[in-house]
From Swiss-Prot:
Designated name of the protein: Cytochrome b
Subcellular location, record wording: Mitochondrion inner membrane
GO molecular function: metal ion binding; ubiquinol-cytochrome-c reductase activity
Record-listed heme b b566 binding positions: H97, H196
Cofactor note (record): Binds 2 heme b groups non-covalently.
Subunit-level organization: The cytochrome bc1 complex contains 11 subunits: 3 respiratory subunits (MT-CYB, CYC1 and UQCRFS1), 2 core proteins (UQCRC1 and UQCRC2) and 6 low-molecular weight proteins (UQCRH/QCR6, UQCRB/QCR7, UQCRQ/QCR8, UQCR10/QCR9, UQCR11/QCR10 and a cleavage product of UQCRFS1). This cytochrome bc1 complex then forms a dimer.
Function in brief: Component of the ubiquinol-cytochrome c reductase complex (complex III or cytochrome b-c1 complex) that is part of the mitochondrial respiratory chain. The b-c1 complex mediates electron transfer from ubiquinol to cytochrome c. Contributes to the generation of a proton gradient across the mitochondrial membrane that is then used for ATP synthesis.
Outcome following mutation: V353L: In strain: Isolate JLP 16556
Membership in a protein family: Belongs to the cytochrome b family.
Superkingdom of the source species: Eukaryota
Disulphides: none
Resulting phenotype, C187F: In strain: Isolate JLP 16556
Annotated binding of heme b b562, by residue: H83, H182
Length: 379
């Protein structure tokens, strides 16, 4: 009798993806973030579903319904803060996952990489719409400012903004459609994750050396399942500690004030995980230029396979490229800090310098350094 996991049509798929999957024997903890993102997605869908049971997407009752969830629903505060801080964890892991892909040259798997970039856009859209839902001051003004950026699109811009708003300002129609999209997008993300994995399993995983590892593979289970479980445990300890001890650490105090269209907050800013892109947007005085820079700051990831000029895939044995990689990380941290500061001197100048450095490092410094390394190695 054949083993059921190898013969059953459905279980066979799971077996080939998570049990008998040949994996490189030398992948490090940097490869844990894929599974952690999967756990985060499941957690977000689950907590989001329970929140949706009590939330009302109406401008008059949205803020009260969130208060009701925290005060009156059994463990509602826990579900709400797990969902809010779970989003932060999601983005931390997402950025680590992308960073690992850049460092070890995983972008060479172009299909997997491009689906990943689309996934990033989908997750960012979902997070933005989720931030808008509690109908606090920052929710309302964040929605107004970010949707209003589309008015920079020539000719169709103003009409497009009013179409998204469902009126002449952010109001009930906007809230209802944002809630609908926030609810459906995670399902689309789940489908995209499956395509992401499908493409990945066509080629097999990359490894820290960047070399072909077909001659040295081990089964995914039990070696990497146990390693992933350890990662999940660390993640849950961090998330639960954050939720229990300081749930509002990553939030904005302005969002505890009900939305008021007549009163603008002194400093409108998005959640911390969008601050780097927000800083790039603000660093350009022209509206259309700012919007293009904002989009391109994420879309630039698509260019990594094209810009790769080194004869080696990974940065493991390329010290000069490693220096540039960490310079890029430091630059992104500076941009994140600047995005949270008011628009005044010296923050404006620092933001502009950091924005130029960001694009200059990726488009010019990294490819030219890789070519120089080839020369030094006489390749």
């Amino acid at each position: 009798m054949t083993n059921m996991r190898k013969s059953h049509p459905l279980i066979k798929i799971v077996n080939h993806s998570f049990i008998d999957l040949p994996a490189p024997s030398n992948i490090s903890a940097w490869w844990n973030f894929g599974s952690l993102l999967g756990v985060c997605l499941g957690l977000q869908i689950l907590t989001g579903l329970f929140l949706a049971m009590h939330y009302t997407a109406d401008t008059t009752t949205a803020f009260s319904s969130v208060t009701h969830i925290c005060r009156d629903v059994n463990y509602g505060w826990l579900i709400r803060y797990m969902h809010a801080n779970g989003a932060s964890m999601f983005f931390i892991f997402l950025y680590f996952h992308i960073g690992r892909g850049i460092y070890y040259g995983s972008y060479s798997f172009m299909d997997t990489w491009n689906i990943g970039v689309l996934l990033l856009f989908a997750v960012m859209a979902t997070a933005f719409m989720g931030y808008v839902l509690p109908w606090g001051q920052m929710s309302f003004w964040g929605a107004t400012v970010i949707t209003n950026l589309l008015s920079a699109i020539p000719y169709i811009g103003p009409t497009l903004v009013e179409w998204i708003w469902g009126g002449f300002s952010v109001d009930k129609a906007t809230w209802t459609r944002f809630f609908a999209f926030h609810f459906i997008l995670p399902c689309i993300i789940t489908a995209m994750v499956m395509i992401h994995l499908l493409f990945l399993h066509e080629t097999g995983s990359n490894n820290p050396s960047g070399m072909n590892s077909d001659s040295d593979k081990i089964p995914f289970h039990p070696y990497y399942t146990i390693k992933d479980i350890l990662g999940v445990l660390f993640m849950m300890i961090t998330l639960v500690s954050l939720v229990m001890f300081s749930p509002d650490l990553l939030g904005d105090p302005d969002n505890y004030t009900p939305a008021n269209p007549l009163n603008t907050p002194p400093h409108i800013k998005p959640e911390w995980y969008f601050l780097f892109a927000y800083a790039i947007l603000r660093s350009i005085p022209n509206k259309l230029g700012g919007v293009l820079a904002l989009v391109f700051s994420i879309l630039i990831l698509v260019l990594f396979p094209i810009l790769h000029s080194s004869k080696q895939r990974s940065m493991s044995f390329r010290p000069l490229s490693q220096c540039l990689m960490w310079m890029l990380v430091a630059n992104l941290l500076v941009l994140t800090w600047i995005g949270g500061q008011p628009v005044e001197h010296p923050f404006i100048t620092i933001g502009q310098v950091a924005s130029v450095t960001y694009f200059f490092t990726i488009l010019i410094l990294m490819p030219s350094t890789a070519l120089m390394e080839n020369k030094l190695l006489k390749w």
